[in-house]
Amino acid sequence: MGSSFLITLREGLEASLIISILLTYLAKTNRQTESRVVWFGTFVAIAVCAVVGTLVYIFVNGLNGKVEQAVEGVIAVAAMLVLTQMIFWMRANARNLSTELRSKVDGSSKTVLFTIAFVAVFREGLETALFLLGAKTETASGSSVVIGGLIGLVVSAALGLVVFKAGSRINLKAFFNVTAILLLLFAAGLAGKAVHELRELIGWETGLLITPAWTITSGAWSASGGTFYDFMKGLFGWHASPERLRVGAYFVYLIPVLISYFKSSKDEKQLVS
């Protein structure tokens, strides 16, 4: 539940911010009557994403055996790559996002307004669907993913409304930095998941790298740890008895991306100063 909540909270807020920028600019330029076009594009995108996401979920949920392992491994890799790209893209473009959107809106037709809103929400929706599939394959609990995702969407919508009302008085930089780091940890878990699934797919069952890196048999950090264990497993890819290969994949991904993320943050501060 924790991973799906974080995913929909982040993605939902990004979509909400884009729509808020569009609506605010239309209001400031006395084009309030065209706001319904933005809302129409938003709701159409949500509906299309819901249908596509449901169909893909039904397809994936019906798989088993080697095919299931292959698909889950591919989904984990795809979600990890797209999630990483999304985080670094947002960091690089967040500062100029408002200006770029306003330039697109200036003198644009209703069709263009619809397209901007639709594409923005549809992109975030597809990313969300992919990430939630990755979360589902990791937790193996569709209901917890759905519940966490719905809660995240509700909270993101509420935050988006607050941002829309408050405008530029709210600084969301800290929020996006914290969620970015948490999502990179989630992506590292997906890297480990992908290696695990693909290793099982090819039948690699023996060797030094397949030996458990550690084994915890009791307590909150064990498989019998209940809600806490499920939360850590779903959000950070934690396992009570992971093979060394899985742990290695986790850190081979995590260390370089964290270094790169903090380096880009440092470079950004130096550029500003």
Segments from the language model and where they lie:
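Multi-pass alpha-helical transmembrane bundle typical of ion/small-solute transporters
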Residues: M1-R123, T128-S273
